[in-house]
Amino acid sequence: MIRVRAGERRITVSGHAGHAPAGQDIVCAAVSALMYALAGYLEETEQAARSDIRRGYADIEGAGDCGAAFALVRCGMEQLAAAYPGCVEIIGS
C-alpha cells in the first residue's frame, strides 16, 4: 500500500501499491507521475525547498506561494485512493 501524508507545502509518499507486478503497476506509476510533476514544477518556479525521490519513497517540500500545486497533487492522490482502495491511503495532513 502507498501511504500519502500531505500538507499545505509538504507531501510524503511511501510504499508500493501492489496492484500489479513491479514495472507494470499503473497505481505506482500514477503516484510517481504526480510526485515528479510537483518536483519539476517547484524547481522550475524556484519554489522547491527540498525534494527526495527514490524507489518506494518521495518527500517534497515547497517554499513561497506553492500551496495550489500541493492542493492539486493531494486531489490527485485522493482520487487514486478512491479509485484503487487498498492501494493508496491518505494519512492525516
Predicted regions and their residues:
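N-terminal intrinsically disordered, cationic/polar leader segments
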Residues: 1-26, 35-93
